[in-house]
């Protein structure tokens, strides 16, 4: 198959979106109410990793980066995720805390995008979550100097076994280089696929302490 044939095959990959629309009259006043409803439906539909979200950050040269992390908590203060504080995303957030999140619920023909500002979680919040994780995950947090270059996977595996032996008694301590971020919600956009590419998009945006809702063209 030639490169041109392959490109033609990709160009023709499409499907109709038929799972229903989204109407203004059905929207709650608060975006988190709709987010919670959609997240619950994603869980009920047994989607793989329904809490997985794309986190987009920008470096000091304006280059954007994206990666998938798991949402671990949300409330009116924002959406929470955890990471190695030496990671590329953590350094980029330190330089520019304005970030974007995206929940891609393809099987439900939905996506939710959040824009806002990330801020570090308190040590108490981080400690509570860290000790709720499986023990091997706690040890794994110690192993990796995230985003650094390594020569082989065996280095990580050997370090994991070494630390598992070291921490076999008592609690695994919280690494000083591990923490979390809360992303405030300045905007939240809900997208529902529609027939003939007439998708439904609604944007919630803060306006003098209240939420303004606008329909956007697809």
Swiss-Prot record:
Keywords for this protein: Flavoprotein, FMN, Oxidoreductase, Pyridoxine biosynthesis
Gene3D superfamilies, sorted: Electron Transport, Fmn-binding Protein, Chain A (2.30.110.10)
GO MF: FMN binding; pyridoxamine phosphate oxidase activity
Reactions mediated catalytically: pyridoxamine 5'-phosphate + O2 + H2O = pyridoxal 5'-phosphate + H2O2 + NH4(+); pyridoxine 5'-phosphate + O2 = pyridoxal 5'-phosphate + H2O2
Essential cofactor(s): FMN
Taxonomic superkingdom: Bacteria
InterPro entries with a match to the protein in the record: Pyridox_Oxase, Pyridox_Oxase_CS, Pyridox_Oxase_N, Pyridoxamine_oxidase_dimer_C, Split_barrel_FMN-bd
GO BP of this protein: pyridoxal phosphate biosynthetic process; pyridoxine biosynthetic process
Entry binding sites for substrate: 14-17, 72, 129, 133, 137, 197-199
Entry EC no(s): 1.4.3.5
The protein's annotated pathway: Cofactor metabolism; pyridoxal 5'-phosphate salvage; pyridoxal 5'-phosphate from pyridoxamine 5'-phosphate: step 1/1; Cofactor metabolism; pyridoxal 5'-phosphate salvage; pyridoxal 5'-phosphate from pyridoxine 5'-phosphate: step 1/1
Cofactor mode of binding and number, as noted: Binds 1 FMN per subunit.
NCBIfam families in UniProt: pdxH, PRK05679.1
Function noted in UniProt: Catalyzes the oxidation of either pyridoxine 5'-phosphate (PNP) or pyridoxamine 5'-phosphate (PMP) into pyridoxal 5'-phosphate (PLP).
Assembly notes: Homodimer.
Protein's name in the database: Pyridoxine/pyridoxamine 5'-phosphate oxidase
Gene: pdxH
């Amino acid at each position: 198959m030639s490169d041109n044939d392959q490109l033609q095959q990709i160009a023709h990959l499409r499907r109709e979106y038929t799972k229903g629309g989204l109407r203004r009259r059905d929207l709650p006043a608060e975006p988190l109410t709709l987010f919670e409803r959609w997240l619950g439906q994603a869980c009920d539909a047994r989607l793989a990793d329904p809490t997985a979200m794309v986190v987009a950050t920008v470096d000091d040269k304006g280059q954007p980066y994206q990666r998938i992390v798991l949402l671990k908590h949300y409330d009116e203060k924002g959406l929470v995720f955890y990471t190695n504080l030496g990671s590329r995303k953590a350094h980029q957030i330190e330089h520019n805390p304005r970030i974007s999140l995206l929940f891609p619920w393809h099987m439900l023909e939905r996506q939710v995008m959040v824009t806002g500002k990330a801020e570090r979680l308190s040590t108490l919040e981080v400690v509570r979550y860290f000790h709720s994780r499986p023990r091997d995950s706690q040890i794994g947090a110690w192993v990796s100097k995230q985003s650094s270059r390594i020569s082989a996977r065996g280095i990580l595996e050997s370090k994991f076994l070494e630390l598992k032996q070291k921490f076999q008694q008592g609690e695994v301590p919280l690494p000083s280089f591990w923490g979390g971020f809360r992303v405030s919600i300045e905007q939240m956009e809900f997208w529902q696929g529609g027939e003939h590419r007439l998708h439904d998009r609604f944007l919630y945006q803060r306006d003098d302490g209240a939420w303004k809702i606008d329909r956007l063209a697809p």
